[in-house]
Amino acid sequence: MGDSVLSAIQQTITQRKSANPSESYVAQLLHKGEDKILKKVIEEAGEVLMASKDKNPSHLVYEVADLWFHTMILLTHHDLKAEDVLDELARRQGLSGLAEKAARTES
């Protein structure tokens, strides 16, 4: 289920790239460029931290959803997709975190 939801959201975000910025929040962010998108991602990340400190699970889920959404917009700005991140996570699955980190420092 999660993958299909991410795919549907990704498809909508990609379609919004060519939408009128006055009619679409996503198109507006993409039109304003990377700095505006990064500002939103940072803002949403801060809200995730605050929600975590609040110890309210539903609020945390809400804010993480916002962060994921805005991160997907950032990926789209760079012509990447959520699927690219899922592929990277799949690549790392079953790999020790310490081994993965060591492999990064070697390359």
Swiss-Prot record:
GO terms for cellular component: cytoplasm. Its EC number is 3.6.1.31. Pfam families: PRA-PH (PF01503). It is found in: Cytoplasm. InterPro entries: HisE, PRib-ATP_PPHydrolase-like. GO terms for biological process: L-histidine biosynthetic process. It catalyses: 1-(5-phospho-beta-D-ribosyl)-ATP + H2O = 1-(5-phospho-beta-D-ribosyl)-5'-AMP + diphosphate + H(+). This is Phosphoribosyl-ATP pyrophosphatase. It comes from Neisseria meningitidis serogroup C / serotype 2a (strain ATCC 700532 / DSM 15464 / FAM18). The gene is hisE.
